[in-house]
Amino acid sequence: MPTIHRPRMGSLAYSPRKRAKSPVPKYHAWPAYQGEPALQGFAGYKVGMTHVIMVDDHAHSPNEGKDIMVPVTVIEVPDMRVAAIRVYRHDTYGNHVLTEVWADSFDKELSRRLNLSKNYKREEAEKKIREALEADKIVDVVALTYTRPSVLTGVPKKVPDLMETRIDGGSMTERFEYGLSMLGKDFDIRSLFKVGQYTDVTAITKGKGTQGPVKRWGVHLRKRKHSRGKKERHVGTLGPWTPHHVRWQVPMMGQMGYHQRTEFNKRLLKIGEDGAEITPEGGFINYGEVRARYVLIKGSVPGPSKRLVRIRHAMRLGEHKIREPTIGFISLESKQG
């Protein structure tokens, strides 16, 4: 058997492993879209996990056509609202915000998050954007959307979470006109996603604070005579003599968890309206009852309960096709143990 060389477990691509700047995840890329202008993402709050019994509809699967048990994550997704339209221009240094067009009505919920300038004039902002569109200087159009946690009982917060959601489809002018038509209006997840569709989910993972190299990087415990130095949960070496400093690749203690992570190709199994049909006996642990619209995502989702989860169309879809699953049973057994 060959010698196993494993200086660490975990990718260095995620370095530096530090705390996320915000509990609201940010998307830096969106999948290609062809069609009429439409919003490209949604957000909800993680409730917890349960399991369902469904028919395995994957072709050539050993259990094709048979009932299988599938773990699912419940995400509560009340309607979101469009607060503003933001456009980007491009120069030598990258994309920059040109200006924003805000809705005429500034509701009480959003006023908890930010204050609109008293000197703001919507007509001037629209005129500036239209002139830039005619000059072909606009490279992207996004909507500033926000959640409404005040309608939920499981999330103890009233301040909405504000985020950018891309508008795609058609020309830049068509996207901008679509955004103007959505200002101040609500939209729900049913207008963006279909049951059986594959999605990408993004959230901030559970925070675990400062951890040592054994738990953080999976290095081996020091054994036999190496442990006689009264240090067992330490890395064996900090590096070579030269260069005369500790390199960043050396597995060391530090922050673990509370990082932004994206999981690809998570299948959306159900969009439900009645929370009672999914709430287990005694409610979900650390959350309670589901009262608003919800979705079932196959498998796990990053983060603890009550954490904001963003959903977008799958970027690495491959050959997956949209097939509405056949769910025969949803477990309502108590999660209290």
From Swiss-Prot:
Keywords (A to Z) from UniProt: Ribonucleoprotein, Ribosomal protein, RNA-binding, rRNA-binding
Molecular function terms from GO: rRNA binding; structural constituent of ribosome
Alphabetized SUPFAM superfamilies for the sequence: Translation proteins (SSF50447)
Keyword Ribonucleoprotein recorded: yes
GO cellular component: cytosolic large ribosomal subunit
Physiological role: One of the primary rRNA binding proteins, it binds directly near the 3'-end of the 23S rRNA, where it nucleates assembly of the 50S subunit.
Identification of the protein by name: Large ribosomal subunit protein uL3
Species for this entry: Methanospirillum hungatei JF-1 (strain ATCC 27890 / DSM 864 / NBRC 100397 / JF-1)
